[in-house]
Amino acid sequence: MTELKNDRYLRALLRQPVDVTPVWMMRQAGRYLPEYKATRAQAGDFMSLCKNAELACEVTLQPLRRYPLDAAILFSDILTVPDAMGLGLYFEAGEGPRFTSPVTCKADVDKLPIPDPEDELGYVMNAVRTIRRELKGEVPLIGFSGSPWTLATYMVEGGSSKAFTVIKKMMYADPQALHALLDKLAKSVTLYLNAQIKAGAQAVMIFDTWGGVLTGRDYQQFSLYYMHKIVDGLLRENDGRRVPVTLFTKGGGQWLEAMAETGCDALGLDWTTDIADARRRVGNKVALQGNMDPSMLYAPPARIEEEVATILAGFGHGEGHVFNLGHGIHQDVPLEHAGVFVEAVHRLSEQYHR
């Protein structure tokens, strides 16, 4: 494979020295970019965009042409795995993702296949290979998956949810069925991420978007336990380099110590967690990624720079910080504000790495 020209992101995740703090943005390939909207229109719909390796590659690279980001992230969706299990994923205007046949009981779980990532999810691996080729070693490529718990919420609820009553009913009334589903998902996600790594992903991230809706005990049993299983099963080296793994539970700030025990390399932080506090608690074990409130990008440039400076000072000197937003970038953020953010991270962080 091509020599990596900028490996700041990988080095920071492994708490190795860097010249400046690396930065990328969750959902950096997305609707805030006019060129993304044009490519998506060309594809016809969202899943067609995900399933076309050339177009998925194009949208992955778009933000890198605008901003000096330190990593590219595969353009895909967390729901590719449940889709490959045959649940019939479709998108409803204004409603988000839906499944035609949600999982309602243990019998439904038993029928679910564990998808072969090179077959049913081959389009994702094609995209990874295409992106790696086109990146020409400029920056590393991040692969990702949803966590078993987060994927299960969509599969059991039949789509997005605000109250999670359907999956919580299963969790409390039929825990065996839910554990069976989560176990199958953990196996599927492990295979899926390992296939992404073999195809060329140089780091991977597990997005546990809905872990924060659980009690502490339930989080340990129904979310973290299965993420830990995945971390244990991942290829941690490829192409002569370590492949770092980041866990991100939105709303999971109170569980950082337990998350750090999984053996992952880094933890993603949402904007509700104080990064100085997080570093005090787990900084000797893992790197930290985050954690500016994505809505800060609506603020005037001077205020964005001030916030970047505050977060950098909160983390302080030394290694192990990847700057990011605390969740995905909003679709109506001014393009130049994203540019101000990225530039400020590089310029203002240099003093912390001398």
From Swiss-Prot:
Pathway: Porphyrin-containing compound metabolism; protoporphyrin-IX biosynthesis; coproporphyrinogen-III from 5-aminolevulinate: step 4/4. Substrate binds at R27, Q28, A29, G30, R31, D77, Y154, T209, H327. The record marks D77 as: Transition state stabilizer. One of its GO terms (biological process) is protoporphyrinogen IX biosynthetic process from glutamate. Pfam families: URO-D. It catalyses: uroporphyrinogen III + 4 H(+) = coproporphyrinogen III + 4 CO2. GO terms for cellular component: cytosol. Its main location: cytoplasm. SUPFAM superfamilies: UROD/MetE-like. HAMAP family: URO_D (MF_00218). Belongs to the uroporphyrinogen decarboxylase family. Homodimer. This is Uroporphyrinogen decarboxylase. The gene is hemE.
